[in-house]
């Protein structure tokens, strides 16, 4: 079984998906981590962190590196790089590289392969998870929140290294890019459960989702 969670950046997808995976006993996957790892690969390939590389060059670089899945984490050449991919430098470039159709195809293929060759249940979160990657998921969720709430969440995650105004501006740019992508854009899919998390705590959101999930299972019996 797959529970797919979609929504904009900093809407709570990762935190909620992780918590739900514990409560429901599902494995957790974040597609965003894959795109961030690929962005890290790109950044390691040139001197200036403000430069961008072409799609063909990035596709070749990805093929030269080993991205593997271990339990609930993606590894780059056997290394857990989570502490290297959650920063403003990655934030600035990840939407650009994730707009490359070839890169999206690689990520989507890897996600589907992980699920295909496993008997486990999964909670998978990320943009376009409910529309492109796993539109047939048994339960689809779209999490949302106001731009100010999302900026505040990101501010707390980053220990105040950027101002709220900078984070809000970055998120607005990210939203605009994500909603206007040629392929895999951010949008509501048919049959999705929409939930605004702006003024709800983690436990409250998880309880609402679990209640809705259990009700859906009862109705489908």
UniProtKB/Swiss-Prot annotation:
Chain residues that bind ATP: 7-15
What's an example GO BP annotation here? pyrimidine nucleotide metabolic process
Domain of life according to the entry: Bacteria
Gene3D superfamilies noted in UniProt: P-loop containing nucleotide triphosphate hydrolases
Where does it primarily localize? cytoplasm
What is a single cellular component term in the Gene Ontology annotation?
Answer: cytoplasm
Q: Which CDD domains match?
A: CMPK
Protein's cellular compartments: Cytoplasm
Q: Which reaction does it catalyse?
A: CMP + ATP = CDP + ADP; dCMP + ATP = dCDP + ADP
- Listed SUPFAM superfamilies: P-loop containing nucleoside triphosphate hydrolases
Q: What is its EC number?
A: 2.7.4.25
Q: Which InterPro entries would you find in this protein's record?
A: Cytidylate_kin, Cytidylate_kinase_dom, P-loop_NTPase
For this UniProt record, the keywords arranged alphabetically read as follows: ATP-binding, Cytoplasm, Kinase, Nucleotide-binding, Transferase
One example of the protein's molecular function in GO is: CMP kinase activity
Q: What's the short name of a Pfam family annotated to this entry?
A: Cytidylate_kin
Q: Which family does it belong to?
A: Belongs to the cytidylate kinase family. Type 1 subfamily.
Under which name does UniProt file this protein? Cytidylate kinase 1
- Which organism is this protein's natural source? Borreliella afzelii (strain PKo)
């Amino acid at each position: 079984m797959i529970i797919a969670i979609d929504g904009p950046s900093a809407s709570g997808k990762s935190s909620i998906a992780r918590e739900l995976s514990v409560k429901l006993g599902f494995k957790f996957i974040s597609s965003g981590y894959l795109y961030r790892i690929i962005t890290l690969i790109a950044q390691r390939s040139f001197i200036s962190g403000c430069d961008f590389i072409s799609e063909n060059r990035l596709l070749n670089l990805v093929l030269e590196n080993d991205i593997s899945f271990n339990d609930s984490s993606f590894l780059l050449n056997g290394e857990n790089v989570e502490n290297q991919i959650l920063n403003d430098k990655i934030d600035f470039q990840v939407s650009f590289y994730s707009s490359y159709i070839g890169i999206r195809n690689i990520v989507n293929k890897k996600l589907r392969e992980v699920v295909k060759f496993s008997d486990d249940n999964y909670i998978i979160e990320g943009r376009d998870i409910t529309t492109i990657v796993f539109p047939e998921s048994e339960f689809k969720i779209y999490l949302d929140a106001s731009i100010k709430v999302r900026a505040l969440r990101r501010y707390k995650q980053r220990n105040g290294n950027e101002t709220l105004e900078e984070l809000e501006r970055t998120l607005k740019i990210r939203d605009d890019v994500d909603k206007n992508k040629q392929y895999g854009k951010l949008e509501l899919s048919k049959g999705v459960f929409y939930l605004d998390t702006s003024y709800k705590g983690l436990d409250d959101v998880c309880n609402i989702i679990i209640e809705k999930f259990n009700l859906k299972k009862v109705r489908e019996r």
